[in-house]
């Protein structure tokens, strides 16, 4: 593997979890690798690295995207949220709903599901079961069978935006 030359680096101005920063990134580096390795945001998981499993899902300007398929340079001028942004020390209402419904087992896929669910609930605070299933259809889980994940997302809407309850 060859080491990138300085000319292969691109300076970007990006907001990550509410904090704006200017950083130099390898022009070929994925956003997932940049966030995990340079920003130390390891909630992002790399599963398939082909955009199929959803474990690397983040929100970019409010839309769920696969960070393994997105170049870090594409983050220039954008607002990015990762699973680390969902709570401020205590579990978020959505995370509490996942806990209440036992919507995770090994946990590898959980961050991706949480980010996809966050996109849905911020756009549609009272989704139907069918809308939840559709919103989560790009995320794979080998452990739960999905039912408890759907139940958790359906249970969370009344609590979104209310960290106390």
Curated annotation (Swiss-Prot):
Primary subcellular site in the record, as a coarse category: cytoplasm
Pathway, per record: Alkaloid degradation; nicotine degradation; 6-hydroxypseudooxynicotine from nicotine (R-isomer route): step 1/2; Alkaloid degradation; nicotine degradation; 6-hydroxypseudooxynicotine from nicotine (S-isomer route): step 1/2
A Pfam family annotated for this UniProt entry: Fer2_2
Summary of the protein's practical applications: Due to the increased usage of tobacco products, the industry generates solid and liquid tobacco wastes containing high concentrations of nicotine, which dissolves easily in water leading to the contamination of the ground water. Nicotine-degrading microbes can be used for bioremediation of these nicotine-polluted environments.
Annotated GO biological process: alkaloid metabolic process; nicotine catabolic process
Cell compartment(s), UniProt: Cytoplasm
Keywords of this entry: 2Fe-2S, Alkaloid metabolism, Cytoplasm, Iron, Iron-sulfur, Metal-binding, Oxidoreductase, Plasmid
Annotated positions binding [2Fe-2S] cluster: 48, 53, 56, 68
S-S bridge residues: none
PROSITE patterns noted in UniProt: 2FE2S_FER_1, 2FE2S_FER_2
Cofactor entry: [2Fe-2S] cluster
Cofactor notes: Binds 1 2Fe-2S cluster.
Activity regulation statement: Nicotine dehydrogenase activity is inhibited by tungsten.
Induction text: Expression requires the presence of nicotine and molybdenum.
Top-tier EC class: oxidoreductase
Cellular component GO terms, alphabetical: cytoplasm
Record EC number: 1.5.99.4
Reaction catalysis annotation: (R)-nicotine + A + H2O = (R)-6-hydroxynicotine + AH2; (S)-nicotine + A + H2O = (S)-6-hydroxynicotine + AH2
Cited function: Component of the nicotine 6-hydroxylase, which is involved in the degradation of nicotine. Catalyzes the hydroxylation of the pyridine ring at C6 to form 6-hydroxynicotine. Can use both L-nicotine and D-nicotine.
Assembly, per entry: Heterotrimer composed of a large subunit (NdhL), a medium subunit (NdhM) and a small subunit (NdhS).
Protein's name in the database: Nicotine 6-hydroxylase small subunit
Species: Paenarthrobacter nicotinovorans (Arthrobacter nicotinovorans)
Gene: ndhS
């Amino acid at each position: 593997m060859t080491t990138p030359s300085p000319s292969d680096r691109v300076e970007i101005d990006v907001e990550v979890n509410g904090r704006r920063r200017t950083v130099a990134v390898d022009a070929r580096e994925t956003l997932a690798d940049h966030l995990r390795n340079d920003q130390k945001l390891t909630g992002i998981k790399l599963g398939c690295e082909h955009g199929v499993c959803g474990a690397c899902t983040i929100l970019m300007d409010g839309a769920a995207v696969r960070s393994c398929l997105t170049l870090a340079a594409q983050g220039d001028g954008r607002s990015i949220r990762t699973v680390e942004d969902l709570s401020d020390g205590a579990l978020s209402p959505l995370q509490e709903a996942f806990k209440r419904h036992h919507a995770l087992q090994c946990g590898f896929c959980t961050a991706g599901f949480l980010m996809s669910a966050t996109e849905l609930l911020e756009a549609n605070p009272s989704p139907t079961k069918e809308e939840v299933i559709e919103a989560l259809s790009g995320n794979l889980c080998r452990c739960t069978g999905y039912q408890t994940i759907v139940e958790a997302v359906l249970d969370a809407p009344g609590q979104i935006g209310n960290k106390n309850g």
